[in-house]
């Protein structure tokens, strides 16, 4: 039986309401339960893709590059570096492997021939799509076990996990319906 998600914080009138529950940790205490849940959820989420990527001799870095090149054909290398928050040196090996294996191609920019724009090849698009379907299946299974509001609550949570100073840039890459959602601290950033 599904229950609805309440967005109101629990504020019991007395500690009697907490009988049978683990007391909340003081604000200064590490949130080990959430840290560990996040770790295990991430491990399993990326693990699905990792197993497929192993067939190609690729890893998570290849997945990240391929994902954003697939989602944004014509992405400039500088923009990819900014999205991934890595150095050009860190990107070079991974990008070279994707280029050499025929999953990504680089083209000169139309206005600036020195600029390199990245595009997925048909083979790269196929792999990116397979990876996205694999990870989407996990989301669908999980959301199928939760109330309908869980998807929006999860999206709000993940958006809130992004540094406020970077949130607008990330939001610009999201579908229009997701861009409209504002978090309270967005106004302060």
Label the model's feature ranges:
Residues 1-56, 183-189:
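N-terminal leader segment of winged-helix/HTH proteins
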Residues 6-8, 17-20, 46, 96-159:
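Charged, amphipathic alpha-helical coiled-coil/dimerization segments
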Residues 47-90, 101:
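N-terminal helix-turn-helix DNA-binding core of bacterial DNA-binding proteins
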Residues 150-189:
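Exposed, interaction-prone assembly regions rather than primary DNA-binding/catalytic cores
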